[in-house]
């Protein structure tokens, strides 16, 4: 570093003799200090090359995925996935035999489209991609980690996007909700993700009474109400309360049995109300009269 300092001072002063005595600095050191290495799109391409290389080890592919995801947290880099034609290879990893790679691919998809309408639209250009993620979320044979990441990806794909939400519904997305919410062995995190996905769809589609009836018919409402209990995770309770508020706002009319169950379950939440979202709690309280 001292050598670099002497060289830079002499060079700035135009003292060729002093600069020569100091000696030329290490090019690698200059690159580290002042940049000039591979640009981020090139790093993205290199990472994907490792991921797609059949000779690369799984560990090396996981490192490449970590690097790729870190890069596409930047909005411009996320949008460059389409420009660099990297969506197709990324989506193909959803069918990898390696569970960890499927999980990483889902995580990258979810991060790339998060609050990014352009990347959402780019993802939707790929036929069958939505269906693949829905199936990963649906499969009981998949690990909890993969399924939870699938719900994460789906939530970010549909959020504030009417076309994506409609495609999700058309591909049978609503049918995966009730089984996840009812299954006793399903982790709380996945249930929270599932309800977050459902509320994103409801909001994006500006759901009407007919859509809310669909939620009832598919047993999603029934499965959700099972989690209105003081022993449940507060975040899970919040999601259910928010679902009720959204359904009411869409014009849904709850029947006598439903109102009775909601009222009884809601009353049991009083001891934990300070842990819950105040707005949704009060909105449901007002709804019940």
Swiss-Prot record:
Compartment list: Cytoplasm
Chief subcellular location: cytoplasm
Question: InterPro entries, per this entry?
Answer: ARM-like (IPR011989), ARM-type_fold (IPR016024), Armadillo (IPR000225), Hsp70_NEF-Inhibitors (IPR050693), Nucleotide_exch_fac_Fes1 (IPR013918)
The answer to whether keyword Isomerase applies is no
Give the GO cellular component terms, alphabetically.
cytosol; endoplasmic reticulum
Keywords carried by this UniProt record: Cytoplasm, Repeat, Translation regulation
* Keyword check for Endoplasmic reticulum: no
Top-level taxon of origin:
Eukaryota
Q: Which GO terms describe its molecular function?
A: adenyl-nucleotide exchange factor activity
Q: Where are the annotated ARM repeats, by residue?
A: 13-56, 75-114, 118-159, 162-203, 222-267
Coiled-coil parts of chain: none
Task: Give GO BP annotations, semicolon-separated.
Answer: cytoplasm protein quality control by the ubiquitin-proteasome system; regulation of translation
Q: What this chain does, per the record?
A: Functions as a nucleotide exchange factor (NEF) for Hsp70 chaperones which accelerates the release of ADP. Required for fully efficient Hsp70-mediated folding of proteins.
Q: Which family does it belong to?
A: Belongs to the FES1 family.
Its recorded name reads Hsp70 nucleotide exchange factor FES1
Q: Which organism is it from?
A: Eremothecium gossypii (strain ATCC 10895 / CBS 109.51 / FGSC 9923 / NRRL Y-1056)
